[in-house]
């Protein structure tokens, strides 16, 4: 029995891939501008990329930013993401601070979904997952490679490991340098959904060559896709209008 993840009015893991747009503001003013802009678009989930925020180590500023996003996009589930530099983030955050910030965000009890990177200390990850679930938040365990696409077996291994840690959703995003890389990601997505995972999956081949993976989730098994309203957070992201039109077209002609 496949599980879905229900957050607010959004069900992740069935139907069309849900569209997520990141907020990338460096200041409270920029976050407010982006949140107000996003409120005019039709999409499903907002991701706050807190690694872009200049005051990410100031908990009072983090709370203010979350309040601004909630005021403008309160009907949307929010993902809190503190992306590390090694996985494509904006700034370096030491291991201890990474977990401390994520813990304090969860303790606000005002978060829907937390993104935790796979390649951190296992015990710390499990502790954070337990805290998230205690405070009513879902967890994405993610892995990103902005240089290459690992082998199919390695993708399967990483996502199975993420699921075994207790994730509600697992995510893999890798760089596609050629069409073979794209096929590797699509087939790994198919295998994970058909043979391994009972939870929602996000699978993306980044870059222009991997663009098809952002649209074909309903066919191959990826449950969330990322789009942009302003700035991009990863190579190959397209506008929310383009993504929505193509995802809806595929849905219409595959059901």
From Swiss-Prot:
<dbReference type="InterPro" id="IPR013785">
    <property type="entry name" value="Aldolase_TIM"/>
</dbReference>
<dbReference type="GO" id="GO:0003855">
    <property type="term" value="F:3-dehydroquinate dehydratase activity"/>
</dbReference>
<feature type="binding site">
    <location>
        <position position="83"/>
    </location>
    <ligand>
        <name>3-dehydroquinate</name>
    </ligand>
</feature>
<dbReference type="InterPro" id="IPR018508">
    <property type="entry name" value="3-dehydroquinate_DH_AS"/>
</dbReference>
<keyword id="KW-0456">Lyase</keyword>
<dbReference type="GO" id="GO:0009423">
    <property type="term" value="P:chorismate biosynthetic process"/>
</dbReference>
<feature type="binding site">
    <location>
        <position position="237"/>
    </location>
    <ligand>
        <name>3-dehydroquinate</name>
    </ligand>
</feature>
<comment type="similarity">
    <text>Belongs to the type-I 3-dehydroquinase family.</text>
</comment>
<feature type="binding site">
    <location>
        <begin position="47"/>
        <end position="49"/>
    </location>
    <ligand>
        <name>3-dehydroquinate</name>
    </ligand>
</feature>
<dbReference type="GO" id="GO:0008652">
    <property type="term" value="P:amino acid biosynthetic process"/>
</dbReference>
<keyword id="KW-0704">Schiff base</keyword>
<dbReference type="InterPro" id="IPR001381">
    <property type="entry name" value="DHquinase_I"/>
</dbReference>
<dbReference type="InterPro" id="IPR050146">
    <property type="entry name" value="Type-I_3-dehydroquinase"/>
</dbReference>
<comment type="subunit">
    <text>Homodimer.</text>
</comment>
<feature type="binding site">
    <location>
        <position position="214"/>
    </location>
    <ligand>
        <name>3-dehydroquinate</name>
    </ligand>
</feature>
<keyword id="KW-0057">Aromatic amino acid biosynthesis</keyword>
<dbReference type="GO" id="GO:0009073">
    <property type="term" value="P:aromatic amino acid family biosynthetic process"/>
</dbReference>
<comment type="pathway">
    <text>Metabolic intermediate biosynthesis; chorismate biosynthesis; chorismate from D-erythrose 4-phosphate and phosphoenolpyruvate: step 3/7.</text>
</comment>
<comment type="function">
    <text>Involved in the third step of the chorismate pathway, which leads to the biosynthesis of aromatic amino acids. Catalyzes the cis-dehydration of 3-dehydroquinate (DHQ) and introduces the first double bond of the aromatic ring to yield 3-dehydroshikimate.</text>
</comment>
<protein>
    <recommendedName>
        <fullName>3-dehydroquinate dehydratase</fullName>
        <ecNumber>4.2.1.10</ecNumber>
    </recommendedName>
</protein>
<feature type="active site" description="Schiff-base intermediate with substrate">
    <location>
        <position position="171"/>
    </location>
</feature>
<feature type="active site" description="Proton donor/acceptor">
    <location>
        <position position="144"/>
    </location>
</feature>
<dbReference type="Pfam" id="PF01487">
    <property type="entry name" value="DHquinase_I"/>
</dbReference>
<feature type="binding site">
    <location>
        <position position="233"/>
    </location>
    <ligand>
        <name>3-dehydroquinate</name>
    </ligand>
</feature>
<keyword id="KW-0028">Amino-acid biosynthesis</keyword>
<dbReference type="GO" id="GO:0046279">
    <property type="term" value="P:3,4-dihydroxybenzoate biosynthetic process"/>
</dbReference>
């Amino acid at each position: 029995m496949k599980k879905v993840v229900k957050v607010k009015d959004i069900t992740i893991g069935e139907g069309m891939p849900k569209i997520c747009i990141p907020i990338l503001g460096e200041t409270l003013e920029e976050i407010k501008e982006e949140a107000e802009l996003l409120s005019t678009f039709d999409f499903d989930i907002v991701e706050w990329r807190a690694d872009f925020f200049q005051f990410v180590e100031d908990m009072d500023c983090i709370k203010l930013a979350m309040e601004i996003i909630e005021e403008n996009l309160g009907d949307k589930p929010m993902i809190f993401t503190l992306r590390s530099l090694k996985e494509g983030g904006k700034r370096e955050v030491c291991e201890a601070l990474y977990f401390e910030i994520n813990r304090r965000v969860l303790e606000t009890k005002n978060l829907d979904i937390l993104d935790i990177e796979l390649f951190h200390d296992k015990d710390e990850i499990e502790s954070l997952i337990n805290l998230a679930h205690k405070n009513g938040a879902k967890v994405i365990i993610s892995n990103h490679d902005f240089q290459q696409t690992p082998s199919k077996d390695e993708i399967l291994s990483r996502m199975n490991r993420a699921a075994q840690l207790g994730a509600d959703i697992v995510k893999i995003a890798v760089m596609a340098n050629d069409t073979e890389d794209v096929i590797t990601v699509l087939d790994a997505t198919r295998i994970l959904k058909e043979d391994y995972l009972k939870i929602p999956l996000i699978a993306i081949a980044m870059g222009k060559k991997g663009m098809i993976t952002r649209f074909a989730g309903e066919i191959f098994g990826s449950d969330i896709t990322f789009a942009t309203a302003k700035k991009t957070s990863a190579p190959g992201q397209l506008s929310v209008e383009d993504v929505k039109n193509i995802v809806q077209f595929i849905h219409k002609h595959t059901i």
